[in-house]
């Protein structure tokens, strides 16, 4: 078996060509650099990052270019203090050995830094105090003179006259005054109007009041009638009936209101009596109750027509429309009416 494996191995290897010999290749030449390779810094050598300094000279940490703190006389471990102490005892007047620096002279006429000079009677401060008092007096004189000059200049200046307004400005002012005091002008005009006999004037006012009351009631009835006919033509008979019920409530309300105003002629007692006997504020409540009971009882049992709440309320507020028309008529009559001429007596009183 070993012989067979050797024969198979030798037969499978390719033959070596005769033109190539084993010694025909030349060796590769390696050229090394002349410089030495740099090593990584370990922080131990002088000058390296984290290493010791390159020189052994002491560094000047404090004061920049000043003396070295190790050799200065301020440290307690200085060994050369004996010579300095001997010089201090031998010649105490030497200024070079004085540790305290010389102070500059304080500015001003009085030095508060030296407290002992104030307690001493030998120090004469009369000149400084006299000069300060003179300066204060001089400043006061200057201020008084300047104030006097200002007052004289104000007195000499000519008085300022108000300019007359232009026509447009006067019209604007008149309109603003009329808008602000329009009601007061009318009131004063009525007060200045000459009055006749009080009884005759009261009778005229009473007659005018009754005319106005009857006019408002007739106007309410007329507007309500027009609304009732319009509701009957445009809508259903049920809506017309509801509007008519509200119109009746409106007429009742106006009647009660007129009676309350009539009671004011008797004074406070009449006002209280009229307010108690004429509960006109309950009229809309009564209308709502009639609407509820009518639809709940009369409609299902007796077959009456159904009522609507909104037409009833519209018919009730018919008196508001009549009052509004009456107010517009009064405003138009006041604006179109020319103001009556004022008598000479009232003009003289003005």
From Swiss-Prot:
| Protein name (record) | Protein CONSERVED ONLY IN THE GREEN LINEAGE 160, chloroplastic
Instruction: Please give the chief subcellular localization of this protein.
Output: plastid
Q: Which Pfam families match?
A: CGL160_C
Instruction: Note the topology in the membrane.
Output: Multi-pass membrane protein
In its UniProt record, which GO terms are filed under biological process? chloroplast proton-transporting ATP synthase complex assembly
Q: Does the keyword Thylakoid apply?
A: yes
**What happens biologically when this protein's gene is inactivated, per the record?**
Reduced growth rate. Increase in xanthophyll cycle activity and energy-dependent non-photochemical quenching.
Q: What biological function has been recorded for the protein in this entry? A: Facilitates the assembly of the membrane proton channel of the chloroplastic F-type ATPase. Specifically required for the efficient assembly and integration of the CF(0) subunit c into the chloroplastic ATPase complex in the thylakoid membrane.
Where is it located? Plastid, Chloroplast thylakoid membrane
User: Which of the residues bear the PTM Phosphoserine?
Assistant: 117
Keywords recorded for this protein, A-Z: Chloroplast, Membrane, Phosphoprotein, Plastid, Thylakoid, Transit peptide, Transmembrane, Transmembrane helix
Spans traversing the lipid bilayer:
213-233, 239-259, 276-296, 304-324
Locate the compositionally biased regions of type Polar residues: 7-26
* Any one annotated GO CC term: chloroplast thylakoid membrane
Q: Where is the transit peptide?
A: 1-46
Give the region (Disordered) as residue ranges. Answer: 7-58
